Amino acid sequence: KTSTTGYVQRQLIKAMEDLKVSYDYSVRDSGGNIVQFIYGDDAMDATFVESQPLLIIKLSIDDITEKMYFSADTKWNKLIKVNSASRMLKDTKYQDKIDENFKKILNHREYLISVIFNKDPQNNINYPVHIQRIIENNITKKNTKSDINPIEILKLNSKLIKKCFILEKFKNNKIFEILVDIHLNPKLLIQKYNISKEEYTIITDKIYKKFNESKISPGEMVGVLAAQSI
């Protein structure tokens, strides 16, 4: 049996040794034939992949609400500075936007459980950009109120997600979007960390940089590794 599997693996290595990542992130053989349209379906370098927490999978809806939802009766003056609160309250639909974001979090939870984990929910997921670590390494515990409000955070989160993609024609960054929405949740950032606008900017800049650093390099020979992983 060992000799058979060894033979099969050698055959696979021989057949796949010329596979490499092209500049459009497709995997092609030496003849230019496409084997995979996007390397690994996300174009991320496996050497950067690591386990990171999801926070919401095994929590009840009530617990998620407590951690991640600002209700309509939130006392904003206790959490964010007056100017920041004033900017938000000028938007008559600010609560609708908060509600919509929370529904999105719950939809993410359902997607992870049913699609990603196939009804066997896990607390962690493998992905290159460890957002929680970036947050904790670039934020300081303090007693001052935040000078950035939830609506500003949601708007900037959306901008971050939109600019982190592989190709203009391939913007499948669903897992990244979920991780951003979870870890950069306004209530977590404001209530737990009292985040400042400066800290938020530093964090999102580093997330953007890490996302781009984690992409597979065009020209990388990936066939042998893939063959040995089967």
Question: Which residues does each predicted region cover?
Answer:
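Core, soluble structural subunits of large cytosolic macromolecular machines
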Residues: 1-230
